[in-house]
């Protein structure tokens, strides 16, 4: 998903597409972004015109949008930058537990239980209609990751990131005295990002999108952690296994996880 169309966020696309092609990818690639996505990608593809896979476009026109792709629920939300910009929440939702009692109460034949547990709706030859909610309990906690960059703090960000396992958040400026610059160019300081994480009650936050002038970013983290203790600097190759993941069974995770 593209957050917005400033050069530092889109110029690497042609190389990525070519790498996918060289890796013999053939399945379609879905791209999500603000209005103008297909036009922007088309221009960038001048140097990557021949690809062995189809590109599909989802352009976001409204302040918020909800998209389902391959078992992932994606929520796009408008943020506050100097051009149209979105943040994204990606969730792997987890269905409730299968209830034998519910299935028996509704006299659902046992041969359909497994299919219903997997989320399938069933229409029988004799006209009976069975849905997963007839045999499943309340939804359980899945995995939720929120990503935003190039924005001032917004209520939409706090609301969308609520209870995320991980918030990947811009922190353009570490120096507190650069707050005026952050407001002018529609970015955040480390400390504003920490306040967002605190209000959203996320489990963990990674700061990213640092100013090129920033050196020794780690020196500022003790002050950041006074606001939100579980804050870290993002870096290439960094990974984490959310606590929620340990409670997901393999068959409950989407394809290509």
Could you describe each region identified by the protein language model?
Residues 7-9, 82-84, 153-156, 174-176, ...:
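Active-site environment of divalent metal-dependent phosphoester hydrolases
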Residues 1-32, 57-61:
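Active-site metal-binding motif and surrounding structural segment of the metallo-beta-lactamase
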Residues 183-191:
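Charged helix-capping and loop-helix junction motifs
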Residues 246-255:
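Conserved small/polar residues in nucleotide/adenosyl-binding loops
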Residues 12-19, 215-223:
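Metal-dependent catalytic neighborhoods of phosphoester/phosphodiester hydrolases
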Residues 1-5, 146-149, 168-170, 205-208, ...:
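Active-site neighborhood of phospho(di)ester-bond hydrolases with catalytic His/Asp-centered motifs
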Residues 217-237:
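Short, electropositive alpha-helical surface patch
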Residues 72-147, 151-160, 166-168:
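Active-site-proximal loop/helix segment associated with metal-binding centers of metalloenzymes
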């Amino acid at each position: 998903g593209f957050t917005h169309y400033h050069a530092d966020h889109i110029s690497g696309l042609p190389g990525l597409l070519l790498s996918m092609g060289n890796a013999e990818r053939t399945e379609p690639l879905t791209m999500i972004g603000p209005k103008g996505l297909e036009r922007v990608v088309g221009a960038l593809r001048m140097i990557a015109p021949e690809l062995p896979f189809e590109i599909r476009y989802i352009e976001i026109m409204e302040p918020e949008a909800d998209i389902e792709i391959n078992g992932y629920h994606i929520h796009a939300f408008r943020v506050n930058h100097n051009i149209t910009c979105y943040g994204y929440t990606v969730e792997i939702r987890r269905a409730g537990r299968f209830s034998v009692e519910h299935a028996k109460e509704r006299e659902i034949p046992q041969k359909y239980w497994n299919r219903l547990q997997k989320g399938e709706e069933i229409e029988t030859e004799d006209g009976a209609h069975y849905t997963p909610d007839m045999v499943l309990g309340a939804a359980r906690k899945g995995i939720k990751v929120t990503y935003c960059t190039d924005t001032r703090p917004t209520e939409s960000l706090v609301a969308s990131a609520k209870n995320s396992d991980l918030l990947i958040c811009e922190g353009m400026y570490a120096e507190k005295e650069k707050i005026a610059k952050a407001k002018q160019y529609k970015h955040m300081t480390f400390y504003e990002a920490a306040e967002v994480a605190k209000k959203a009650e996320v489990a963990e936050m990674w700061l990213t999108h640092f100013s090129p002038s920033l050196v020794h970013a780690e020196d500022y983290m003790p002050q950041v952690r006074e606001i939100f203790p579980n804050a870290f600097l993002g870096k290439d190759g960094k990974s984490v296994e959310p606590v929620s993941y340990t409670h997901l069974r393999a068959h409950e995770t989407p394809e290509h996880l």
